[in-house]
Amino acid sequence: LEDSYLKTCSGSVVEIGEDKSIILDKSIFYPTSGGQPGDKGFLQFGIGRCEIVTTRKGENGKIILVPLNHDYLPKVGDTVEQFIDWETRYKHMRVHSALHLLSVVIPLPVTGGSISDIKGRLDFNMPESLSDKEELESHLNELIAGGYKITNSWITDEELAAQPGLVKTMSVKPPIGSGRVRLVRIGSDDQQIDLQPCGGTHVASTSEIGSMRFGKIEKKGKQNRRVNIHFVD
C-alpha cells in the first residue's frame, strides 16, 4: 500500500470469484502477508453494504476481499466505496513498526513473526535465552519515544540481491517479483535506526506506537526463542 492511512476509497468491481470473493480495480485493503493479518471492513454500494471479514493475496498481485455472507454482493462493474476497519488496522501498524524496532534491540536473525491488534512476536535464532529482558524493554521504549520518522523508498530486485544484509528474516522472503522492492526506513539518513525490505503497513513516527512491554520469551526448538511484546495500555 502506498498510503497506510487511507481509510476509505472508491473502486470498481472487476471480478466475483466462484467462492464469491470480490476483486476491485484498486483496493485499500491489506492482504494477509508477512505475519500481518488481512484487513477487515465493508463495501458500501447502492442502499446496502457488504461486510469483509479478511483479505488475501491472489495470483498476479490480485487483492481478494472475502465477504461475510453471499446474500448481498455487488456485481461486476458496480462502483463501491471501501471502508477498512481502521481501529484494527492502526493497531496492526503500531505493532508492525514496534517489531521492526524489536529487531534492532535484539540484533539476531529473525526466523518468524506474527502481528495482532494487541501484541506481536518475533522468533529469533537465539540459542541462549535473554538475560537482560528489562534493559531490552527499556531500550525498545526509548526508541519508540524518540519520535523517529518512518518512511518508504524503493530499490530494484537486483539492488536488493546485491545487498543481502538488508534482509533480516530467514523464513520469510522479502516482497520481490514485481521488479522493485519497498524499503522501510526508521530514522533519517544521518540517524538511521533501521532499514529493511517490507510490504506491510506502518505508522509515520515511532511515537505513534505507544509504550510496549515484553511478554513471554518461549523456547521454540534448539536454536529459537520467541519474544512477545504487548501494548502497555
Model-derived regions: residue spans:
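Active-/binding-site microenvironments in catalytic and ligand-binding cores
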Residues: L1-D233
